[in-house]
Every structure is written in C-alpha cells, then in structure tokens.
C-alpha cells in the first residue's frame, strides 16, 4: 500500500487495515447509535427516570473530562457536569430525595479527585482529595453515608459523605496494583474488589473501620479483572470479567464454577445479569454477547460498535451499551441480534475527539492494560 500522507509513514499495514475497517463499520446503524462526540468510559442509569418512558436518562462519563446527564428518549444532553481536568471514569448518584434535600452525583477522574455535584444545577459542591493516581471506581452507600473509592494508586478510601464537608475516614491497602471495581456482598458489610492483577480481594468495611479479610478472596484469573457483580438471584454467586478473555462465576463457599467459564476472543470488559436469569458480556472485540446460563452457550451476539465496549446496562427489555467509539446503542432483548440490525437509520459521520494525542495514547494504554 502506497500513500503520501505523512501520518501513515510509520504505521503497519495491519494498523492501516484496522483503521479502514473501523471507519467503514462506523457508519453501521445497528443498535440505533447515539453519537456523543467523545469516548465513553462509563454509563449509569438515572433511576429517577419515569417508568412510563421507553428509554431512560443516563449519566455518561466521558474522556472529554465531563460527565453529562443524557436523555436517550429525546437524544439530548440535559445537564453537563464540567470541572475535572482529566477523563471521568466513574460516577455514583444519590436516590431521589424524599426529604426535599438536593440530590447529588459523585464523579471520579484521572485528575486524582472525586467531585460532588448538584444534579439539578450542575454546580460542583466540593472536591474530595486523597488519591495520588487515577480514580477508577466509586461505590455509594447511602444508608451509611459512606462513599468508597478505588484508584490506580492501589488504595481503597472510605469517605464520610454525610458530614459537611465530606471527610476521609481511612485508607485501605492490600492490592499490589490499581483497583478497577468495588461491589458489596448483599446484606453484609463485606466488600469485594478487583483490578490490574489476577486476584479478587475481600474486605470488611464500616464507618468506624475496615480491614482486608486475607483468608478470603479468589485467585483463578490469569490477568486483570475489570468487573465484579453479585447475582441478584443468588447472593452467593459472584460474576467476574477479566483481561484473560473469560467471564467466570464463583461460589463464595466453593470457589470457581468451571462449567460457567465463558470464553471470549478478547479482553472482557463488563458482565451483567439479565432479568431473565441469563448473562450479558461486553468485550474488547466490539461485540456484546448474551449467554444461556443453563447451558453456558451463547444465545445472541449484538454487533455494531467499532471500538471496545465499555459498559452494558438493562432497562426494561432493552440492553444499553457504551463504547470507546463514542456511541451509545440500544438493543431490544425481545428480538434476536439479527432483528436489531437496522437498514433505514441515517449513517453516522466519522467520530471526533477532544483528547490530545498524548491523552489518546494514555487512554489506549490504560484500556489495554
């Protein structure tokens, strides 16, 4: 292949072919894509969305340094939370307040900080400083008035967000590398974390103190673990998604269930339990898979994204996905993947980005870690 474009001189043939493939795939209408014009790192449901709406509102964490409240039904940004100096990786949102008090959203960022925002006005109320590297995950415990944060600095911080201002209560260490995800074991004060190592660690955390339960935890993955999720239909079952190209189910008392080891062709980025008891998974190969948990086989593959899928959520009968390709797509689970391939949707133009070349390289390195 010959070219006069200087930007192509030091790129491999395979890289150029992949870029061409992605450019061609970027015009596909599958999943009715909403192009948000920035790489999407995370999404969370706005659980105050009225049930009568067909599609929900989402809080969207972007590499463009902002978080936004986006209405999928009208394809419109309702509010923007702007103030971070780095990509926003995660967010947690307070429930609808019945006491008349202001509702808040917490966001974590590459700028090492957590910010608290007024959901309605978009005003930044305060900035929580304590981590020394990227903040990668948050977990809000509203009843206890606590916020847990995990970071690339390998620490887990417990914050008292019921006080004014919020206070750093204590910091827990034990991971050898960054923390990617925190989840709570149902009906307990036990929490599980994973990250840029193969181990899954267990902690006892309360407002007065916390510690690692070193005799607990799981060691079975061969690489980074990106997601942890307890099965709502079985509180003793923990699902994990890993860079070793597998999604696995663990029993808290029996260890790994080899029969539910789900093999993928690339890094697994997310796992979701569906209302019907099946499992959905997101992968760096750009696909979303729905698995039959009784057989361990793939039921459907939803294809449309042209970069790594970063998050999947369920709303009613719809599966919602976000991607580094800057789009959010909606898939109807009541129909097969083939019936989610539209042929009358207007094509999208090539994506744009607000990141510098250095930030893009850092983002790609982080996502591929």
From Swiss-Prot:
Alphabetical GO CC annotations of the entry are: cytosol; nucleus
Q: Which Pfam family, any one of them, does this sequence belong to?
A: WD40
Q: Which SMART domains match?
A: WD40
- The segment annotated Disordered runs over 1-35
Task: Supply the CDD domains for this chain.
Answer: WD40
Spell out the residue ranges that the record assigns to WD repeats: 83-127, 130-169, 174-213, 220-260, 263-301, 304-341
Report keywords, A-Z: Repeat, WD repeat
Q: Basic and acidic residues composition bias: which ranges?
A: 17-27
The record ties this protein, via PROSITE patterns, to: WD_REPEATS_1, WD_REPEATS_2, WD_REPEATS_REGION
Asked if Repeat is a keyword of the record, the answer is yes
Top-rank taxon of the source lineage equals Eukaryota
Indicate yes or no for the key word Repeat. yes
Which protein are we looking at? Answer: Uncharacterized WD repeat-containing protein C126.01c
